A protein has these predicted regions:
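Anion-binding (especially nucleotide phosphate/pyrophosphate-binding) glycine-rich loop
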Residues: 1-119
């Protein structure tokens, strides 16, 4: 788990605003997410859960905790049904591209949508 204080969100918003947050926590597994949730208290509120930051407009520093998932991975659960499981930190457009490369069609119209899967 990556836990930082007074963290710049410059690389986490597509508007490119150089704002900071009081605390930034990035988890990369379900277990880390569970540990994080168990450790949160009132000083972390209001929580802000972000993905790629494409729908995020912060004009000033965020006074609390920002949470970001870095869970990666893609797996086919049922090829015949086109059922895929992916980590919440995967970039959505990359999932669409991956699906096409693996002959799993149907999500093509969702291409070029910014953001991450679990945002």
């Amino acid at each position: 788990m990556n836990d930082k204080k007074n963290f710049s969100l410059l690389g986490h918003n597509t508007f490119g605003f150089n704002v900071s947050c009081k605390r930034f926590v990035e988890y990369s597994s379900t277990e880390e997410a569970q540990q994080l949730v168990a450790s949160l208290d009132d000083t972390d509120k209001p929580l802000l859960i972000i993905g790629g930051g494409s729908n995020l407009l912060l004009k000033e520093d965020y006074p609390a905790t920002v949470i970001h998932s870095a869970i990666r991975g893609i797996e086919v659960l049922d090829k015949a049904e086109g059922l895929v499981r992916c980590g919440s930190g995967e970039v959505w457009d990359d999932i669409v591209d991956w699906s096409i490369r693996h002959n799993l069609y149907g999500a093509e119209n969702l291409s070029i949508i910014p953001g991450e899967v679990g945002a």
